[in-house]
Amino acid sequence: MSGPAASDLESRAKAAQQLAHAPYSKFRVGASVRASGRTFDGANIENASYSLAICAERTAMSAAVLAGARDLEEVAVCTDASPPSSPCGACRQFLYEFAPDPAKVRVTAINGAGERRSWTLAELLPDGFSGRELAVSEPE
């Protein structure tokens, strides 16, 4: 990511991190995705029944899908970790589902200290599995 749009995506991920509900792990995550030219935010939301927690990347992409924005373009993730944490495996797979070309989707991880790491979604999930392998197309 580069330029003002990237800065906006990263700023939104930082703001979303402040809204995380992480009373158990204390690991707050914020995410912002650009899909179909629009931006959507999410934060991790934990639950006392740990398996019911949902990650920031999935809350952001779910908001995009609900708004009809399904073509993933970029992702920014903000954590307090050093170095910044990449998305977990479940989030990588979830995001891959909505990437028209995973090699062109930039995923940037940042933290409050200004550290930054960046990959393509294809680098994070090589040989990923999607509806393309199932020869499934979404209804028009």
Model-derived regions: residue spans:
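Compact, glycine-rich, soluble single-domain proteins
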Residues: 44-58
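C-terminal binding/interaction regions
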Residues: 2-22, 69-140
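Alpha-helix C-terminal capping segments
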Residues: 63-68
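Glycine/charged-rich beta-loop-alpha catalytic/anionic-binding loops adjacent to active sites
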Residues: 37-47, 71-75
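Short beta-strand scaffold segments in enzyme catalytic cores
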Residues: 26-36
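Stable alpha-helical structural segments in soluble proteins, enriched in small hydrophobic residues
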Residues: 13-16, 56, 60
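Short acidic-glycine loop/turn motifs at beta-strand connectors
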Residues: 35-38, 111-113
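Short amphipathic alpha-helical face segments that pack within enzyme cores
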Residues: 55, 59, 90-93
